[in-house]
Amino acid sequence: MLIREVRADEYGLLSELAVSAKRHWGYPERWMEIWTPQLTFAYDYFEEHEGWAAIDDEKPIAFYTLEDNNGIAWLENLWVLPEYIGRSVGKELFHHATALARGRGYKSLQLEADPNALGFYERMGMKKIGERHSDVDGTPRILPIMEIAL
């Protein structure tokens, strides 16, 4: 597996990857309809956002974006194709992101986690530092805000 920068022309593939990864958690189809526009990247998204992809057999199998959030590294869009979940792909990308952020002088990395991914991020050493209350189609959700010191 190779990790490389996302190419701007991969926005369609990565949109499909993100939707597939979200659908893996068994969310209701109505919720997926609501979320799909948020998981669909515009053609210029990766020209404006730094993204890194895990590549297997010359195709993206997972990716993340890294942003500056008021001096804190913010990990966004860590998605893994369902058939690669449990094969250390997410772990490798997470370690890549923390090393990249640390190398740039950030003291911590934060993210907002899907509740289904909470255990993964805890295994990566992250701690819950807060939460964001949300709702989808009238159903309340609590999204944990996680942090790891670099």
Model-derived features: positions:
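Conserved GNAT-fold acetyl-CoA-binding loop/helix
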Residues: E16-F41
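Conserved beta-hairpin
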Residues: E50-A62
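Conserved beta-strand in the GNAT
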Residues: K59-E67, W74-W79
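Conserved catalytic-core motifs of GNAT/GCN5-like acyltransferases
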Residues: Q110-E112, K127-I145
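Conserved active-site tyrosine of GNAT-family acetyltransferases
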Residues: Y121-E122, M126
